[in-house]
Every structure is written in structure tokens, then in C-alpha cells.
Amino acid sequence: TQGTALLGDLSRDLKDEENPDDFTAVTLCLDGIGVVVNKDSAVEDLTPDQITKIFTGEISNWSEVGGEDAPITVVGREAASGTRDGFESIFDVKDKAKYALELQETGLVVSKVASDKNAIGYVSLASVDEEKGIKAVKVDGIEATEENVANGTYTVQRPFVQIYKKGSTDPLIKAWFEFLASDEGQQIIADKGLVPQEIEVPNN
């Protein structure tokens, strides 16, 4: 809001206290958030209610959701993480989640879940790779795939948004969004495991 940058990045919508009417927001793509467990876990599918209760500590043993008789290790990101903000908003666990570990990077979450057969966490869908020792569970029977993010059936997702000051006439802003809307720009987004969206280019 102080005009120190042409563009701002968000992985959520602007909040009322952030003066959304002062900005134009452009959704670049959608990112699924995978709810991940160890690749050898017997758990393949969880309901949103089960996920909520696991992260708030109401469910604390895998046997309660069809897994082995073992305590659940709940792993999350640090408080400033956009992935954490998105996940906690979707499952309504802000200020309620009880983490055994809060980690600074996606890679650390992946490593912890891969090394602990009783762990559960969340990461951007692009980071889910069974070769790294983790897998994303289905949510209400829906697989965590880019296709299901795009068609809206996999609802654990968040937007990647860029904002700029409403009424800005800086040619760099227009050129940037023209590039992102081009075939090359859209392919770069898709190559990152994200779901491209139709990008509205400023006409100033």
C-alpha cells in the first residue's frame, strides 16, 4: 500500500483490512494442497472432518481412521507460510491446529513425512512425489491431481494471485501480464505443476 513495488504476490484473496478496493487482483493459477502421509501408510482416503480432527488433535491415533495402531505425528509449516494459511483456512483450523513440528520449508515437511511412517502434513501438490517417500491421500474419495484441481472436484486448493495498484499505467505491468497470458507463459506455469488460469491483461 506504500507503492514500493509494482506487483505483490499472494496465495489467498485480499483481506478487508488490506484495502482490496485499492488494487486490481489477477489470479495466475491454482495450486492444489496435498494432504500427505508416508508412502507406506495404509491410509489412502480421509474425509475433511477427519483431516480437521487430526490437525486439532481430536483424532490422535491412525487406528481411528483405518490405519495402524500408532500415534499420529502432525507436521505443519511455520506461521508465515502461505501454504499453512491456505490449508488452515480450508479446514477451519486457524489457531486450533496442534503441530508436533512447524517447519520452515516444504522440503523439510517432505523429508519428515518420508522418514516417519506415522506423520501427516501438507505441501503444494507440485511437491508430492512417491519417489520422495510421500503420497497424497484422497479427500472424500477425490484424488489430489492437477486435473481435479482444474475441474474443482479436489477442493483443497488455493489461488496464486498478483496485485497492482488500481489505475496503474506502468507499461511493465502490462508487458508482464501479456507474457504470462502467452503460450510460453502459460506453459511455464503448467510445467511447475500448477493449473493456469485465463489471465486478464490490463488494457491501459
What are these regions (language model features)?
Residues 1-204:
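Exported/periplasmic ABC-transporter solute-binding proteins
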